[in-house]
A protein has these predicted regions:
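N-terminal, Lys/Arg- and Ser/Thr-rich interaction peptides
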Residues: 2-13
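Residue-level detector of well-ordered alpha-helical segments, enriched
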Residues: 32, 47-56, 88, 105-109
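Divalent metal-dependent phosphate-bond-processing catalytic cores, especially two-metal-ion Mg2+/Mn2+ enzymes
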Residues: 2, 16, 20-30, 34, ...
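Helix-adjacent hinge/juxtasegments
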Residues: 68-111
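His-Asp-centered metal-binding catalytic motifs of divalent-metal-dependent phosphohydrolases/nucleases
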Residues: 49-67, 72, 92, 111-117, ...
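Amphipathic alpha-helix face/heptad-repeat signature
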Residues: 7, 51, 81-85, 126-129
């Protein structure tokens, strides 16, 4: 079997282990991987298969390290996130190497998934763009509801920071999303409009 197809199967099998299920029975992690890959295809129409696989690894086995295992404050969140970047990147690299993917490609995926070189590495930037667009398109309302105790300004600051991480092309894509008015208002506020 082709190493890329073998890697895809191994990655998706890891996603299937996610105990969180959607109403249709699919794992939440597999659904997220599909959304990430779809955004990569939209943002980078000639994306190499290895970049598409990297997109599928964005939250690889994230479920295995619950946010609740770290302090609830900002420092705890940042520590958790940094740990996940490295863990997910290493797991992705291991699965790719087991599948026969060349070491150089597996190392690229490691860099992209671990967020190395954001703003300077096109692969890392593409994954960050896709992750933020998936968040805006699919997750922001549930995030707002889950954190109803946050003041509006905190959401605006989150959006401002996220916007600053987007490439110009991804910013344009974000502006084309059919977002709820409350989200659009917060984005406008974040952008000073």
């Amino acid at each position: 079997m082709d190493p890329l197809e073998t890697a895809r199967q191994k990655i998706d099998a890891a996603h299937e282990a996610d105990p969180t299920r959607l109403p249709d029975g699919r794992s939440a992690e597999l659904d997220y991987a599909d959304k990430m890959e779809a955004w990569i295809i939209r943002l980078v129409p000639d994306a190499p298969e290895i970049l598409k696989l990297a997109a599928r690894c964005q939250h690889l086995e994230r479920w295995s390290v619950p946010r609740s295992t770290y302090p609830a404050d900002r420092a705890g969140y940042l520590t958790w996130r940094k740990f996940l970047y490295t863990k997910q990147a290493q797991r992705a690299k291991d699965l790719l190497l087991e599948s026969g993917i060349p070491e150089s490609d597996a190392e690229d995926v490691y860099k992209w998934v671990s967020k190395s070189g954001l703003k300077t590495n096109p692969g890392t930037q593409a994954l960050e763009d896709a992750a933020i667009l998936v968040f805006l398109e699919n997750e922001i309302l549930s995030f707002v509801a889950q954190h109803s105790d946050y003041p509006r300004e905190k959401f605006v600051n989150i959006l401002r920071k996220s916007w600053g991480k987007l490439s110009p092309a991804a910013q344009q894509a974000a502006l084309q999303l059919d977002l709820p008015p409350i989200v659009l208002d917060m984005i406008r506020e974040a952008l000073g409009q």
